């Protein structure tokens, strides 16, 4: 059960950071990184 909690916290923190960068910077940078 602890593993699920830790994985959930990790995913949530990564998601928050990802969305923060996504909304702060223009999507052009993300497309360039993907290519």
Swiss-Prot record:
Q: Give the transmembrane region(s).
A: 3-23
Q: One GO CC term of this entry?
A: chloroplast thylakoid membrane
Please indicate which superkingdom the organism of origin belongs to: Eukaryota
Where this protein primarily resides, as one coarse class?
Answer: plastid
Q: Name one GO biological process term.
A: photosynthesis
Outline what the protein does: Found at the monomer-monomer interface of the photosystem II (PS II) dimer, plays a role in assembly and dimerization of PSII. PSII is a light-driven water plastoquinone oxidoreductase, using light energy to abstract electrons from H(2)O, generating a proton gradient subsequently used for ATP formation.
Q: What is this protein called?
A: Photosystem II reaction center protein T
| Organism of derivation | Gossypium hirsutum
